[in-house]
Regions:
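Nuclease catalytic cores
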Residues: 2-46
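Catalytic cores of nucleic-acid endonucleases
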Residues: 84-86, 97-150
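Surface-exposed beta-strand edges and their flanking turn/coil or helix-capping segments
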Residues: 69-72, 113-116, 159-160
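Domain-level recognition of nuclease-like catalytic cores that cleave nucleotide substrates
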Residues: 130-209
Length: 209
C-alpha cells in the first residue's frame, strides 16, 4: 500500500492542482485595481475548491502557535504576535485536514507566519503570491504559487495573462517530526495561556499619551 502523503507533499500536490485548474480555465484579468485583482484570484481559488468538492471559508480565524507577549512601543502597549489572526481562505475537506491559503501582492505581510504555523500543525499550506519580486523565504511545509502580473501607472492597474502549467511553484523544506512535536507542545502551552488570560480580570486598554 502506498504511504499517505505528508502535509509537505500535500501542499505541493494542491499547488500543482490549483495551477492546472487556473491553466485549464484560462484564468486572467486586465486593468484591475489591487483589491479587484486579489478578489479575482480569491474567486478563482474558491471555484477550484468547489469543483474539488470542498467547503470554502473566507477570513477564517486561526491562532498563532507561540503565545503573545505584552510589548511596549512609545506610549502604547500591544500584544505580539496578536491574539488572533485570519487566513484569506480555509478549504475544508472530508478526507483530510483543511488547506490554509494566503493571497498576497507582496512579501510584506503576515502570510509567512500564518502559513508556517498551519504547516507545523500538519495542515497543507498554499501561498499565492502575485505581482512583484519574490524575496521572502518559503516556510517549511508551505508551497508558493507565483502569479506575476504587469502594472500600469496613474492610475495603477494590474493585468495577468492566462496562467500556464509552467507557473512557478516554490516549496519550503520538509517539516521534521521533531519540529512538529515541539510546535504542537508550544500550541498546547498557548491554549493554556489563553485560558489563564480569560480567567484574569480585564486589564485596562492601551495607555495613550
Amino acid at each position: 500500500m502506498a504511504p499517505e502523503p505528508t502535509a509537505n507533499g500535500e501542499s505541493e500536490i494542491f499547488a500543482t492542482a490549483l495551477r492546472a485548474h487556473l491553466s485549464e480555465t484560462r484564468f486572467a484579468f486586465t486593468g484591475l485595481t489591487g483589491k479587484e485583482a486579489t478578489r479575482s484570484i480569491t474567486r478563482a481559488v474558491a471555484e477550484w475548491s468547489m469543483a474539488s468538492g470542498w467547503r470554502t471559508r473566507c477570513e477564517a480565524p486561526m491562532r498563532y502557535i507561540d503565545p503573545p507577549r505584552l510589548q511596549t512601543g512609545g506610549c502604547r502597549g500591544y500584544w505580539s504576535p496578536p491574539w488572533c489572526a485570519y487566513l484569506d481562505l480555509r478549504l475544508r475537506r472530508k478526507d483530510g485536514p483543511p488547506i490554509a491559503v494566503e493571497i498576497d501582492r507582496s512579501d510584506d505581510s503576515t502570510a509567512v507566519d500564518k502559513l508556517r504555523d498551519e504547516a507545523l500543525r500538519g495542515r497543507p499550506a498554499l501561498w499565492i503570491r502575485w505581482h512583484g519580486a519574490l524575496r521572502a523565504e518559503v516556510p517549511a511545509g508551505v508551497a508558493r504559487l507565483h502569479l506575476p502580473t504587469r502594472s500600469s501607472t496613474s492610475p495603477v492597474r494590474y493585468s495577468r495573462a492566462p496562467v500556464t502549467d509552467t507557473a512557478s511553484i516554490t516549496l519550503g523544506a520538509d517539516v521534521t517530526p521533531e519540529a512538529r512535536a515541539e510546535a504542537l507542545n508550544r500550541d498546547q502551552q498557548r491554549k493554556a495561556e489563553e485560558k489563564r488570560a480569560a480567567a484574569r480580570p480585564q486589564a485596562p486598554g492601551p495607555i495613550r499619551c
